[in-house]
Amino acid sequence: MSLFAMSIRSLRKQLRQSRFFSRLYYAFGLDALPVLLQFPSYRRSQDKAIDKYASEDQLNKKKAIKRDMRKCYYQIKANPSEYFLMGLDTMSRKERAEFLTDKYMYMTMGKLIPRRVHDEEIENKVNFYNLAKDFFGRKVCCVECDADYDAFKHLALDVHDLIVKPNFAAMGSGIFAVSIDNEADARKVFEIIRGGGRGKWIIEERIKQSKEMAALNESSCNTVRYLSFLNKSGFFAITPFLRTGRKGSVVDNAGAGGIFANVDVKTGVVYTNGIDELGNEYECHPDSGIRFKGWQIPRYDEMVSTVRKMHRELMPSHPYIGWDMALTEKGWVVIECNWGQFINQYADHIGRKKEFLRYVYGK
């Protein structure tokens, strides 16, 4: 990366540190600089998306497709993958304007919540646990240095089955499950976690999900992503989605090979087929055989009540939060929260920008 590009990157970081400069940053269009300064990288992402998602006909029209991708970026900030997964490649300019892309969502939220606040309160898993521990429903410890071994050993020998997460893990990256039966195993796992001696980790008792949720896929903790909004008019939500992993996987993220399906916000009933990160569609879960459409999220009203309580008590200054919720035999617990992606648009190809803006700004 050139010195000029590094300087711009530093400037972008500084501008995001405060609410005032965040607004200036987006008002002057500095968010478009990465595409201009890192154009080779953007072109590679175009090629990767085309190879991954394009039809045979589209492969013969690469130049036109790339040109259209750039139009989508400048219109709604769509990245190359979103171009295909949202179905933007077949839409008019007017239809595309209805869709909420990741970048546009982060731009909007960046004007309301400084990025440092987002990173400290949401992305930092240890900080979030300290804030929301009453809603975790499981035992947890944090590992940052060698002095944390005793706490880790105590947890490991108490519950045996653990989920280990890097403090800033995203899309399931770096997360693994481990079973520990004795102190020797605890020491080995701790040394693996400590690795080079850097970084925080959060160690959680593995969730024992309810029988109904486990039926979808037993190896992963299957969850519901609930998108909640809090403004002066009250509490609202936009199309939640069910997330389930594949056989043998411990995570349910679409980015890690999982499958998701949209859920009716009022009834808790799944109303779309399942979709994976490649855009493949499934009437039934490929491993368990359970049909997605018509599947009822168990104890759905309890989950909504729990999310409402968390948002009002824990994050009252955040207009929008995406909550990952898991169901145990004792009730709903929170896995984590984030601003997340509106991948529900991939499943039904219905844009949710207007709805998002209405709830975020309380209009």
Predicted stretch roles:
Residues 114-224, 232:
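Active-site nucleotide/adenylate-binding loops and adjacent lid/helix of ATP-dependent enzymes
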Residues 162, 236, 333-335:
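Protein kinase-like catalytic core scaffold
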Residues 142-146, 242, 321-324:
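Acidic carboxylate-rich catalytic motifs and surrounding loops in phosphoryl-/glycosyl-chemistry enzymes
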